[in-house]
């Protein structure tokens, strides 16, 4: 099956699933705001051999990144029926390089050798920047990238994340602005510049309730 056909079929299954996986029910809108929004800003990035997608939901952006760039990815979500959807749909469509795990990001420390294992991490519409950095940075190798998809209101969050960046060993290297159907979107590219203390991420719920300040 051609890559384009795989993507189109995956989008069709996303919007038609009885599980509430996306607010987009129109195929063309879903192709724009789910698929294109996932891959367009990342075309100039090297995800490395193995990337992590935290809070993947129905597999966005992880499935599309894996298919588009032929990369291996671990897609993590705490809602098991969403993870099951990804597993079944990838099997049906012959998507080979997607692995899945039903877990909270905070739980990865206890579920395998994931600390500083990944070449990159991605996250889309999960939480505020400081929280997402705590949930991703511990699992990315030094020299790796953290890619956060954000809307126009990211500036205030970024200002509140300065101490989190220092504590977690990451720095902001680029803010990439792009447009999907006339709507401004931003990809925040962080670089992992030093080892993250192994006390991170903190236990379940704490990164959200008490972000590093």
From Swiss-Prot:
Localization: Cytoplasm
Enzyme class: transferase
Keyword line: Cytoplasm, Methyltransferase, rRNA processing, S-adenosyl-L-methionine, Transferase
Gene Ontology terms for molecular function: rRNA (guanine-N7-)-methyltransferase activity
Signal peptide (from-to): none
Organism: Fervidobacterium nodosum (strain ATCC 35602 / DSM 5306 / Rt17-B1)
InterPro entries on file: rRNA_ssu_MeTfrase_G, SAM-dependent_MTases_sf
Pfam families assigned: GidB (PF02527)
The organism's taxonomic lineage, starting at the top: Bacteria, Thermotogati, Thermotogota, Thermotogae, Thermotogales
Family classification: Belongs to the methyltransferase superfamily. RNA methyltransferase RsmG family.
Purpose: Specifically methylates the N7 position of a guanine in 16S rRNA.
Gene Ontology CC terms, in alphabetical order: cytosol
UniProt-annotated binding residues for S-adenosyl-L-methionine: 55, 105-106, 124
Protein name (record): Ribosomal RNA small subunit methyltransferase G
Entry EC no(s): 2.1.1.-
């Amino acid at each position: 099956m051609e890559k384009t056909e795989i993507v189109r079929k995956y989008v069709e299954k996303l919007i038609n699933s009885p599980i509430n996986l996306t607010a987009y029910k129109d195929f063309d809108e879903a192709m724009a705001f789910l698929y294109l929004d996932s891959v367009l800003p990342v075309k100039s990035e090297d995800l490395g051999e193995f990337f992590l997608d935290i809070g993947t939901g129905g597999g966005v952006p992880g499935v599309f990144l894996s298919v588009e760039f032929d990369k291996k990815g671990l897609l993590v979500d705490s809602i098991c029926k969403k993870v099951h959807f990804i597993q079944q749909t990838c099997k049906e469509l012959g998507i080979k390089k997607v692995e899945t795990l039903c877990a909270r990001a905070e739980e990865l420390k206890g579920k395998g050798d994931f600390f500083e294992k990944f070449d990159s991490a991605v996250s889309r519409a999960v939480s505020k920047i400081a929280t997402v950095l705590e949930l991703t940075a511990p699992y990315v190798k030094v020299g790796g990238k953290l890619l956060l998809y954000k809307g126009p209101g990211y500036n205030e969050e970024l200002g509140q994340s300065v101490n989190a960046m220092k504590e977690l060993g990451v720095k902001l290297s680029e803010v990439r602005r792009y447009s999907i159907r006339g709507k401004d979107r931003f990809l925040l590219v962080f670089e992992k510049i030093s080892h993250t203390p192994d006390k991170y991420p903190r236990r379940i719920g704490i990164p959200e309730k008490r972000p590093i300040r």
